[in-house]
């Protein structure tokens, strides 16, 4: 006979505005929920309104978001992620309502890792990210438009996405080296995903100036559509080949490359600390 689950307990976590970091947080909470269920404890994820969760777009209708008074009435016990990570099993057997803090965008944050994210957790994250049909259609048609831009016979194998942000490390040689690797694979059609197109043009157009002829064809993805940040995140996950941003405070392209459905993909990163099984090159 199965033991009935105890009363519902709530769990929440401190977020920042980066979708990639939010996915690390959500994956961590799913892991806790799974372990709690094995201890016959039913636990539910909730967020305080204003906690940066994208509940009106990419995560629309997926999580309970409460106003301050309703959230505070649940009586959360605040726990540092550093304390939880030392003894996560104790939390998973607790019936208290827990709010996790100290989840800064930092490589020292124990949440920021793919080590514990197994295939069931990955599938659940995919379901969450791809649940908004409006964003999915927008990203899909953008991807088809990119293929069309590069030519009628262009395939998924022939293009790569490059994620570059204005707040990136000034080590732009990383991008030059990453593009050289793509060039060695005869991938010269590059979709540039950036938060500042004009700035990115000044950085990346120099790449072609280094060569006698224009080696790469660059397509700059528009930032004009509604919910462009969320749509661009989903768009990145549709690419087989991806050059991850070298911005340590942004995990979007790292997560997009992880979620991409392709098995044999080319994923290049500058981060030696946060890696997943699909990464092929660390520069």
Where in the sequence are the language-model features?
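Histidine-anchored nucleotide/phosphate-binding helix
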Residues: 22-37, 174-183
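Short, charged/polar "capping" segments at the starts of alpha-helices
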Residues: 51-56, 169-171, 197-203, 276-277
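Secretory-pathway luminal glycosyltransferase catalytic domains
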Residues: 52-187
């Amino acid at each position: 006979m199965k033991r009935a689950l105890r009363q519902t307990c709530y769990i929440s976590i401190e977020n920042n505005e980066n979708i990639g970091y939010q996915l690390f947080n959500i994956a961590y909470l799913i892991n806790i929920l799974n372990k709690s269920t094995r201890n016959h404890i039913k636990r539910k994820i909730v967020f305080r309104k204003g906690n940066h969760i994208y509940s009106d777009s990419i995560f629309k209708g997926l999580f309970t978001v409460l106003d301050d008074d309703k959230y505070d009435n649940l009586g959360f016990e605040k726990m540092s992620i550093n304390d939880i990570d030392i003894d996560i099993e104790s939390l998973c057997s607790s019936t208290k309502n827990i709010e996790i803090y100290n989840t800064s965008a930092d490589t020292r944050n124990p949440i920021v890792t793919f080590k514990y994210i197994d295939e069931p957790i990955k599938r659940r994250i995919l379901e969450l990210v791809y649940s908004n049909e409006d964003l999915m259609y927008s990203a899909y048609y953008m991807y088809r438009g990119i293929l069309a831009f590069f030519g009628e016979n262009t395939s998924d194998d022939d293009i790569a996405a490059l994620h570059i942000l204005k707040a990136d490390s000034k080590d732009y040689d990383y991008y030059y080296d990453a593009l050289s690797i793509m060039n060695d694979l005869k991938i010269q059609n590059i979709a540039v995903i950036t938060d500042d197109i004009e700035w990115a043009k000044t950085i990346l157009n120099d790449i072609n100036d280094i060569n006698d002829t224009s080696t790469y064809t660059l397509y700059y993805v528009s930032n004009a559509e509604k919910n462009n940040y969320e749509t661009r995140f989903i768009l990145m996950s549709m690419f087989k080949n991806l050059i991850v941003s070298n911005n340590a405070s942004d995990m979007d392209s790292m997560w997009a490359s992880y979620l991409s459905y392709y098995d044999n993909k080319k994923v290049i990163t500058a981060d030696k600390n946060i890696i997943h099984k699909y990464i092929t090159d660390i520069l």
